[in-house]
């Protein structure tokens, strides 16, 4: 919801401004609930579905930045750093059978947004130390979607699209001549190609996959 509020605030059309004004009170409530909840959240939720903490923080940060809500931005940033800064040598036990988020890559994308460039590069080297040799392999191979009419299995197309988004964003951590940038962008392209053609065609995916496709493409 906060991501929707952020997108509406970015648009200059009269319709967007009207919708943004209508949504603003609810966005403020969500912001306050984040501020109330984050101090209680001792541990992050690392699953590959709706409850993933890194995903929530990443989207909420968009709103905090666009709305100049420095209190929310600081709370989100400090919590993400506290949860994830000591994570090293990620094993990436994924995908799960109904994942639509990569726990590993979503964490890496979240940390990209809360650390400075130098600090993030150091953190990422520790978190994915074998990225230069495309390991863990599971992060580089698109998930197999065996039955797109199954609501849970169809989630895996979302996983491929969200991985494409994360890989493309993570690639920004390195200069253009760094081989790891090429590796990350290649992984993004591979995942996008695997699932973008299936955004439509089966209801179990087509009523939501377009949102993930937009993240992967924009």
Q: Which residues does each predicted region cover?
A:
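Terminal, non-catalytic domain-edge segments
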Residues: 11, 114-135, 139-218
């Amino acid at each position: 919801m906060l991501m929707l509020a952020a997108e509406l605030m970015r648009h200059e059309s009269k319709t967007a401004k009207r919708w943004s004004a209508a949504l603003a009170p609810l966005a403020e409530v969500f912001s306050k609930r984040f501020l109330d909840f984050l101090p209680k959240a001792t541990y992050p939720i690392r699953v590959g579905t709706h409850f993933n903490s890194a995903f929530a923080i990443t989207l909420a940060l968009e709103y905090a930045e666009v709305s100049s809500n420095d209190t929310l931005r600081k709370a989100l940033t400090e919590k993400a750093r506290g949860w994830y800064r000591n994570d090293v040598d990620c094993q990436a036990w994924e995908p799960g059978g109904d994942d639509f988020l990569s726990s590993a890559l979503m964490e890496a994308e979240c940390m990209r947004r809360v650390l400075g460039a130098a600090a993030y590069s150091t953190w990422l080297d520790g978190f994915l130390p074998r990225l230069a040799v495309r390991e863990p392999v599971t992060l580089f191979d698109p998930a197999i979607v065996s039955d797109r009419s199954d609501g849970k299995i169809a989630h895996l197309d979302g996983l491929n699209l969200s991985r494409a988004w994360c890989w493309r964003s993570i690639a920004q951590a390195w200069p253009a001549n760094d081989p790891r940038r090429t590796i990350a962008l290649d992984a993004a392209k591979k995942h996008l190609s695997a699932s973008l053609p299936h955004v439509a065609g089966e209801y179990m995916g087509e009523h939501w996959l377009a949102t993930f496709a937009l993240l992967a493409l924009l």
